[in-house]
Amino acid sequence: DQTGLSQEETLRDADLIVLATPVDSIPMLAVKALNLVNEKQVVIDMGSTKQELSEIISQHPRRGRFVATHPMWGTEYSGPEAAKHGAFTGRTVVICDHELSDPDALVLVEWIYNTIGMPIKYMSSEEQDTHTAYVSHISHITSFALALTVLEKEREEEHIFDLAGGGLESTVRLAKSSPDTWIPI
């Protein structure tokens, strides 16, 4: 805490609150943020699953201040050290349940994503979760399964690395992803 402000004071002073944490913590953080925001502040999330979050905040009196988003970009790395300049440019962002967000909150978030060059798709939370499961989450599950199978069956690790070509390396790359991020998904 470099500012000397409490978490609540920091949230109250922010114009935009961005929740970019593992998905299992986002609903609780979203409720906490919505409990503190005023009619001018906006809360967004970056999580890859939306249905549970949508259900939890659906009846919140400040639901309109929330815009559910999922930027469709990531690597097997996580944390601030994984940041990459220009990573989001040209990548799609999904905005979920946009009709539940206040118009001014939605306009601000659309402006941010348009400014950094992200095409916007609009979907319901359910649609987003279904489509993302097929195009993103299944590839991670497959990568984890292959990596675990190879490590279990091929006991001599030096043979794995000596014999494996680019195909194995490419396929299991996602298995390096943080379990803290992927287990809740």
Write out the residue ranges for each language-model feature:
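Predominantly a Rossmann-like dinucleotide-binding segment in NAD(P)-dependent oxidoreductases
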Residues: 75-93
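Rossmann-like NAD(P)(H) cofactor-binding subdomain of soluble oxidoreductases
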Residues: 31-81
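Rossmann-like NAD(P)-binding element
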Residues: 8-44
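Short acidic-hydrophobic, aromatic-tinged amphipathic segments that line or gate anion-handling sites
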Residues: 2-7, 121-123
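Internal alpha-helical scaffold of NAD(P)-dependent oxidoreductase catalytic cores
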Residues: 87-177
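Short glycine-rich anion-binding loops that position phosphate/pyrophosphate groups of nucleotides
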Residues: 23-26, 48-49, 147-148
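C-terminal active-site/capping subdomain that shapes the small-molecule cofactor and substrate pocket
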Residues: 183-185
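Short, hinge-like loop/turn segments at secondary-structure boundaries
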Residues: 2-4, 60-63, 83-87, 137-141
